[in-house]
């Protein structure tokens, strides 16, 4: 929870600003949530044919998300030596990683457009298309849509599509994260979290998107620290509310740093609060510019990394995770550039987000310091959670391009408990007073 300018902008498929959205295209030449159904001209991106909606035969949740494509082989590998020939399909952060760190390479596999959502979810997107609106940087009249702007007209609309994307109504799960220093030394952080959306609460409250509660399970210095977030929909009318329970002091306090560029426990300062989940929180501190669409090699269908037979010691390496375990595919992504507004505060002066067209999920971020230098690079490997019928993150990794340190989170190879989607919640369990009760049991 607590956690450049683009080198080349080829294959830009930006929607003309003057074109009014034609929502009748949804489910026709566009997918139900607005991606281009057709493949690309040279056949390296196939047409979308409904995505992956069933688990492999014989699958059980205790196995974790096993790879439904075990026989796929890499088509080629991008390294620092051959990166120039692929640069038009790389992010600035990928180019810099390839240039600086020979340990980083990218195995590129055939593209499989596995993203899919339940029909009831996509039906609601279509019903609400054209009715949701922006007011300043906030969202109005969401009405249960999880893709408020399926044919986006500006960068802020794309950002909001990511922020409210469908994540199963509620999810409970545990994971391990690893801060990895430039020397290669690392340690393990355990965290358990639940995020319950308003519609899955026993007593839904107005203007509430979700409730999140999480706590550290290890190391001992962090164990028992609990976080609570109430996330609003309309962030003009109401800001995020957050609290923290400190196990040592046994008290609950407000947590204003659980927002924007706050640096939180367990992060080692390698990422900031609004980078969790690709991007989260109020988008009001940046001016958002839609640069269009690009074809980019991004971590996709990254099931192999979560194989329960693979131990963390086989994943964590110096300067990056084991590249043999990461699958890259060519996908169309929306590119949105955020520039820090005059008079606002944030450690990043500019950031470029790459958002998968099939799922509205942030899959990469180039982050620049306030002097304009490329500072950090994040990648978020996604996969289709076929039992819940939704795209979800397999891992998130934050690279410091200045020194080779990184932070990787979201791993659960050595955890037996499966994720639980469509989880329900009680409002009473997501109140500040409940943190003390929970803290006494940890």
Range-by-range predicted roles:
Residues 23-240, 246:
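Solvent-exposed N-terminal domain segments of exported/luminal and surface proteins
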Residues 414-442:
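Long, C-terminal catalytic modules of enzymes
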